[in-house]
Amino acid sequence: MDFLAPLSAVVLTYREVGGDALGALAEEMRKCAEELAKATPMFVLHTCGRVEVYLYGASEEEVARVAARYRRFAEGVKVLRGAEAARHLFAVAAGLDSMLIGETDILGQLEEAYDRQVKAGYTRGLLKTVVERAVRVGKRVRTETGISRGPRGLGSLAVMYVSRMLDLREASVAVLGAGAVGAGLAMELAARGVKRLVVLNRTYEKAVEVANRVGGEARPLTEEEVEKCLAECDVVFSSVHTLQPVIKRVPPEARVKVIVDLGVPSSVVPNLPVAVVKIEDLRELAEEYNRERAGEVEKAWAIVDEEVARLPRLLARRYVEEATSAIMAQAMAAAEEEGKRAGCDTAVLAAKTTVKRTLLPLITKLKEMAENGKAEEAAKLIQLLQEALQS
């Protein structure tokens, strides 16, 4: 039994389409998840450089419908299946598919998306295992190679870019957004010794958490507070993902000299009367560091490929764990029911103990079979057990 075969991915990145289209597509995929994930496990990854949907157990028709929704926004959509889909996700987690090779922001964004979608019930079952493994692979690559030495991500590049325009040590700086990218920006700016640092976020508690970490001020992300920051700060970084711009105008006599827009779609209206740095402006700087990291890329890919090869057995074991857990729960419930018929707690305990002693050796053997490349045989035995319990 090939536990990777049911995995599918629909992928569109910064290479095929601009940021505004990616932002609109991300909103469409959010709606898609609300509709589809009730029946089919799903994981959506949206960053400034990509919108990717991973499905487990989806039919060909379901995958085709998701891809068709992508094509409303752009061509160049890739549909990946099985090991190819897993390899792509692992490479993304490792930073191998990013504009800045080895960047670490993507790993934080992946974890945030995973946590959010597990809580929502979208990412579950064996797809949950695939995404968990991707996070581990990303961490392993960064531990065992030097692919992330230097700038951590686009936020780091943006700080470097702005530092060539003015002295950040004498600057008041605001960061809009306290997610993975915003928090990374705040840490980078604090390390550079900015004069004053303000962190804004829609969830105020998150702004407080990040601000406390870097010795900055926290504010809620409202239109009024954004305008105050533009009036008071020399530089404003925006890492907010929103369909509507959060910076709509520059107030008269505002202090702001530079706005950095890392939002997808753009979080800044066009034609503002100050310098606006966009993601595209960072490409040349990214390529400079990519050349320095080129020697680590082969090592990183070797880890990715090793982990992809291990994944089927991990999924097989997880499948057996989930299935046998359900069988044990069903058998224990039946034992409890029979024990209650005897009319005493001792009978209930005895029935449960007997069931556990009987099933545990079998469950252990099934797990060993799955780990040793006999997942298909283990699955057939599990199906027989399930049928027996239902009869």
From Swiss-Prot:
Reactions listed under catalytic activity: (S)-4-amino-5-oxopentanoate + tRNA(Glu) + NADP(+) = L-glutamyl-tRNA(Glu) + NADPH + H(+)
Gene3D superfamilies per the UniProt record, alphabetical: Glutamyl-tRNA reductase, N-terminal domain, NAD(P)-binding Rossmann-like Domain
Domain of life: Archaea
Biochemical pathway: Porphyrin-containing compound metabolism; protoporphyrin-IX biosynthesis; 5-aminolevulinate from L-glutamyl-tRNA(Glu): step 1/2
Gene Ontology MF term list: glutamyl-tRNA reductase activity; NADP binding
InterPro entries for the chain: 4pyrrol_synth_GluRdtase, 4pyrrol_synth_GluRdtase_N, GluRdtase_CS, GluRdtase_N_sf, NAD(P)-bd_dom_sf, Shikm_DH/Glu-tRNA_Rdtase
Binding sites annotated in the UniProt record for substrate: 47-50, 98, 103-105, 109
Record-linked PROSITE patterns: GLUTR (PS00747)
Signal peptide span: none
Annotated EC: 1.2.1.70
Keywords: NADP, Oxidoreductase, Porphyrin biosynthesis
Function: Catalyzes the NADPH-dependent reduction of glutamyl-tRNA(Glu) to glutamate 1-semialdehyde (GSA).
Miscellaneous field: During catalysis, the active site Cys acts as a nucleophile attacking the alpha-carbonyl group of tRNA-bound glutamate with the formation of a thioester intermediate between enzyme and glutamate, and the concomitant release of tRNA(Glu). The thioester intermediate is finally reduced by direct hydride transfer from NADPH, to form the product GSA.
Similarity-based family: Belongs to the glutamyl-tRNA reductase family.
Record protein name field: Glutamyl-tRNA reductase 2
Organism expressing this protein natively: Pyrobaculum calidifontis (strain DSM 21063 / JCM 11548 / VA1)
